[in-house]
């Protein structure tokens, strides 16, 4: 099923990015953690927005140049090369991606991404996506609340699980 989420600047209303085929996303400190078609990903939104702005500027400049004027050909080639470089750099804003079923909930707590799925809750490292911890729960893990070294998980079946982590 096609899902689309758009992120905009709350002050200006300007579109920052659009996520296609996305079921869940959480954004914090310039990073987006999102689920798209069997993958969980981390995207550097701050860098991506900067690069997309530059890309838009270069594409607009390219459109203004008349390709029929021979003296413009070198400038056109330089802009095309820069556009290609920017497009490659935008792809590198995807910091990591892992195979993962669709989550019911995503929460960032410190340097951890907490993920609730059917009958399980997991904690992933936000820098790498590598699993740090997981535990079975009864039902779909919708409510994820990290607080004071504990993780409280509520499910669609009414179960509340509490996990305590030692420092």
Predicted regions located by residue number:
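Extracytoplasmic/lumenal domain signature
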Residues: 1-167
């Amino acid at each position: 099923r096609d899902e689309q989420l758009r992120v905009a600047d709350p002050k200006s209303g300007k579109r920052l990015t659009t996520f296609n085929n996305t079921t869940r996303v959480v954004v914090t400190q310039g990073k987006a953690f999102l689920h798209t078609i069997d993958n969980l990903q981390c995207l550097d939104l701050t860098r991506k927005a900067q690069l997309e702005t530059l890309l838009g500027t270069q594409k607009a400049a390219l459109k203004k140049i008349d390709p029929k004027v021979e003296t413009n050909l070198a400038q056109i080639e330089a802009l095309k090369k820069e556009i290609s470089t920017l497009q490659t750099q935008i792809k590198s804003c995807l910091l990591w991606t892992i195979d993962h079923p669709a989550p019911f909930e995503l929460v960032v707590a410190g340097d951890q991404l907490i993920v609730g799925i059917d009958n399980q809750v997991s904690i992933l490292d936000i820098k790498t996506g590598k699993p740090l911890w997981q535990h079975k729960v009864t039902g779909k893990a919708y409510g994820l609340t990290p607080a004071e070294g504990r993780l409280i998980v509520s499910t669609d079946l009414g179960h509340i699980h509490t996990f305590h982590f030692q420092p």
